[in-house]
Amino acid sequence: MAISGPLTNYFVQSIISPDTDETPAAKFSAQFPNPRAPAQSEPLDFPSCSFSASWNFLTPHPPVYQPYIQQQQQQEEGAPSAEGRYLRAWLDNGPSLKSEPLLGPPGDKLGPQHYTVASPGGAAANTERSTHSGNFPDTKGTEGTAGETDRTHQNNPSANWLHARSSRKKRCPYSKYQTLELEKEFKFNMYLTRDRRHEVARLLNLSERQVKIWFQNRRMKMKKLNKDQSKD
């Protein structure tokens, strides 16, 4: 028995339950509720964030030695050492250079400029000086003081070794009479015996050692003269 087309559609629709019209996703959503739904419906309560302006304006050129001093202060917060105090004092009391103007009235010739170094505490005590080519200092007083200093240097050997003078007398152990008598004795005999040396020393008011040394020196002098004559 053959069934026509409209009838077959009717029977197929009657067999399939009316629930089939719904989508599978709707079925599963009805059986298992989505736990994220209430979470999405509730508003999220987060504390409000407020950012304060904690960053200060940074200067492009930091002060000199500032990082080194800050590092020292961080390392030694309790009791700063003597080196740190000296460094800070040196930085605080640094000298400042004050320059004079280089330009003057028209027609004046500028001479050498002098600069004064003034510290922050005693800047008022320092006076500025400028000298021009037309001004000449008085040299009379300076010449007198220079002569006096030269005399003091000459009198004081320790002041200047160029002007040092020995306070010892010139070495002259033998008088003219003693030298003449010793020369006579040397002509008679180049070598003295002990007794003769004792006698000569007694006659000339000398010691035996002085007589002995004189004869030794005289013999060396004669040998040198003979050697020079033989070379000539």
UniProtKB/Swiss-Prot annotation:
One of its GO terms (cellular component) is nucleus. Induction: By derriere. Sequence-specific transcription factor which is part of a developmental regulatory system that provides cells with specific positional identities on the anterior-posterior axis. The keyword Nucleus applies. CDD domains: homeodomain. It is found in: Nucleus. GO terms for molecular function: DNA-binding transcription factor activity; DNA-binding transcription factor activity, RNA polymerase II-specific; RNA polymerase II cis-regulatory region sequence-specific DNA binding. The gene is hoxb9. Its main location: nucleus. SMART domains: HOX. Residues 167-226 bind DNA. Residues 22-43, 116-167 are annotated as: Disordered. This is Homeobox protein Hox-B9. Keywords: Developmental protein, DNA-binding, Homeobox, Nucleus, Transcription, Transcription regulation. InterPro entries: Abd-B_homeobox_TF, HD, HD_metazoa, Homeobox_CS, Homeodomain-like_sf, Hox9_activation_N, HXA9/HXB9/HXC9. Belongs to the Abd-B homeobox family. One of its GO terms (biological process) is regulation of transcription by RNA polymerase II. The keyword Transcription applies.
